[in-house]
């Protein structure tokens, strides 16, 4: 039986879950994985206080683990970027494999880390960096290796999905839904990276590198968060047959790759629209197969630990020969020419001719109107206004922004115009 000597850096919730699983499920891992794991050393800044197991070599100096000659593979679950980068590069230069759950690290430094790993004939496992315990990276690395991926779309941040589910299902305000997520441990005390779209965008960057064989380049990922979504938008979307989800999306067309993470209207007949609470899901569309969907818990100590240990088993069995940037024909670009239908919500004066004027503006810009609904104002402050919601035809990002600005310039329109993408689905 293969023995793998493990050094663990990080003893927070995820680190302790990894350690607990390796110890308590050792027999199961030997039977099902064919691997015996020897925990050589654990790096924890608070030492024995957070590692309640006897007989384990614990150090408060995490660099010791990265340089320990008895360690075969370093597991990095400390989070952050700078110090994690130092630890991982040290371990790779020492000829050690690395397993990480750190999406920010991979999205920011993936190119140089994989180059360094290749130079030292070692592997990097990063399944836990995207979608927690749902094996989406393994699907791209192995299950879909014989197909050409055309696009992917998914819900990759459990915090934002929980908030939107609460708002839609219980008519909760954004603030109360966020507070509930924090009370349940589904959101950090500072949830900014989750709600402003950064977390999902980092994950989308990683998936794009695997799906389309382009370099990691987080700077070319376009993204927005969910802060601007209001209960009105969720209600109007439902009336039109949609749900609003925060969708990470990547697409390859004519050798150009565009990657994004945006609030998006999703047809209620699709599987992604049914993904609720803190769950994650990813739909991958590839030639010859069509759509495959992966669903499961996207975060939490146990799902993340499961993904980490799956990578450890794969490394013990020989790892992967992974060349991320293997297709020089494909080019990653900022999302500007990707065409999609758009949702616009305007608050306008309740007077004759307003709808005709808005329709004329769409016509002037050669943009079709696919659907239009209007309602009386929902607040006492705006009794002399009406809400108008318009679904446009497919337009580029530049056209969508230009149209939004033109609508806001109309004297009959007041307050900001809301604009969201619409996911087209299979094609």
Residue ranges and their predicted role:
Residues 57, 149-153, 161-164, 168, ...:
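Catalytic, metal-anchored helix/loop core of enzyme active sites in primary metabolism
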Residues 58-60, 75-76, 99-101, 124-128, ...:
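General beta-strand structural signal in soluble alpha/beta enzymes
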Residues 84-90, 103-141:
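Rossmann-fold NAD(P)-binding glycine/threonine-rich loop
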Residues 97-99, 369:
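A short hydrophobic/small-residue beta-strand
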Residues 136-149, 160-172, 202-216, 311:
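Oxidoreductase and adenylate-handling cofactor-binding alpha/beta cores
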Residues 176-274, 279-281:
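Substrate-binding/catalytic subdomain of NAD(P)-dependent oxidoreductase enzymes
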């Amino acid at each position: 039986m293969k023995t793998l000597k493990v050094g663990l850096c990080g003893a927070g919730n995820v680190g302790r879950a990894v350690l607990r699983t390796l110890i308590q499920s050792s027999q199961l891992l030997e039977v099902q994985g064919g691997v015996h794991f020897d925990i050589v050393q654990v790096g924890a800044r608070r030492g024995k206080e957070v590692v309640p197991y006897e007989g384990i070599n614990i150090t408060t100096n995490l660099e010791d683990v990265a340089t320990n000659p008895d360690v075969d593979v370093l597991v990095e679950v400390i989070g952050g970027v700078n110090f994690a980068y130092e630890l991982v590069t040290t371990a790779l230069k020492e000829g050690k494999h690395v397993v990480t759950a750190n999406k920010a690290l991979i999205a920011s430094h993936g190119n140089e880390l994989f180059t360094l790993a290749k130079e030292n004939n070692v592997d990097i496992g990063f399944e836990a960096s995207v979608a927690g315990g749902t094996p989406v990276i393994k699907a791209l690395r192995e299950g879909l290796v014989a197909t050409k991926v055309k696009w992917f779309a998914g819900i990759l941040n459990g915090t934002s999905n929980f908030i939107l589910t609460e708002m839609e299902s219980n008519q909760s305000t954004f603030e109360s839904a966020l507070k509930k997520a924090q009370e349940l441990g589904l959101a950090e005390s500072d949830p900014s990276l989750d709600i402003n779209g950064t977390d999902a965008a980092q994950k989308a960057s990683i998936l794009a590198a695997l799906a389309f064989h382009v370099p990691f380049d987080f700077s070319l990922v376009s993204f927005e968060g969910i802060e601007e979504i209001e209960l009105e938008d969720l209600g109007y979307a439902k009336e039109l047959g949609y749900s609003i989800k925060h969708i990470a999306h990547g697409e390859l067309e004519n050798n150009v790759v565009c990657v994004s993470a945006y609030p998006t209207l999703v047809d209620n007949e699709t599987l992604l629209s049914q993904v609720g609470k803190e769950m994650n899901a990813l739909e991958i569309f590839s030639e010859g197969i069509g759509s495959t969907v992966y669903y499961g818990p996207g975060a939490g100590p146990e799902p993340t630990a499961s993904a980490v240990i799956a990578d450890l088993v794969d490394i013990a069995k020989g790892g992967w020969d992974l060349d991320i940037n293997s297709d020089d024909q494909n080019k990653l670009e900022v999302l500007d020419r990707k065409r999609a239908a758009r949702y616009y919500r305007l608050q306008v004066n309740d007077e004759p001719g307003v709808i005709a004027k808005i329709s004329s503006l769409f016509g002037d810009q050669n943009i079709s109107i696919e659907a239009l609904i209007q309602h009386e104002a929902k607040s006492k402050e705006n009794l002399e206004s009406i809400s108008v919601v318009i679904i446009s035809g497919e337009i580029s990002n530049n056209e969508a922004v230009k149209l939004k600005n033109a609508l806001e310039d109309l004297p009959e329109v007041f307050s900001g115009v809301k604009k969201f993408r619409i996911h087209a689905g299979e094609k």
